[in-house]
């Protein structure tokens, strides 16, 4: 379990690009390039490694002012002995006076067969112009898991457009018609509410001891559905060339 970190979790006014997170046992990292996501997205990939009981993160991009940073480890952190994952662990700090804590979540399905889409980047744009998806990197970002599920954390109050992108060149914007994409016409307005749920305490592995109601914070929307499809490659290319005369030729394009 988590012991301490530098900076502290949810620290504000942090200007240090190096983060150290310590746990109570030796750990290792698995598939960081596939599982770990930093938000806002980093154009220069961060250096993330395990060292004994610590995870060390070095952010290469310059820190943006008054911005909440979230490092979502998913299940990349595992104990060194048995390989048990520390599931859904994330770490946040802010470069400003306050830290943003809103979240949205949902599922990406393939439009053709409604199967879950794994490994798709899902991001938010505060710029509501439809062209922002092709011109600007995401403002906040996450990645779908094997069930197609995603959670985008560290969101400020406001209105957003949401998009999915199978980002082959890792620039967090739609600049290739061959990339699989997903989007919603609806404007996303993150919010939260107090909610209750049933929690079970077990006497042993087969006997329920107590069922109690516990309070928690529910982040909304938590049921976004995005349908992914591959864009149509409408780029022109030379399909045929003819030269019927010495001083005359014909070029045909798609």
Identify the residue ranges that each predicted region occupies.
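Acidic, low-complexity Ser/Thr/Gly/Pro-rich repeat segments typical of extracellular/periplasmic
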Residues: 1-147, 151-154, 159-168, 177-192, ...
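Short beta-rich binding modules
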Residues: 197-199
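Acidic carboxylate motifs that coordinate Ca2+ or other divalent cations, activating on Asp/Glu
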Residues: 171
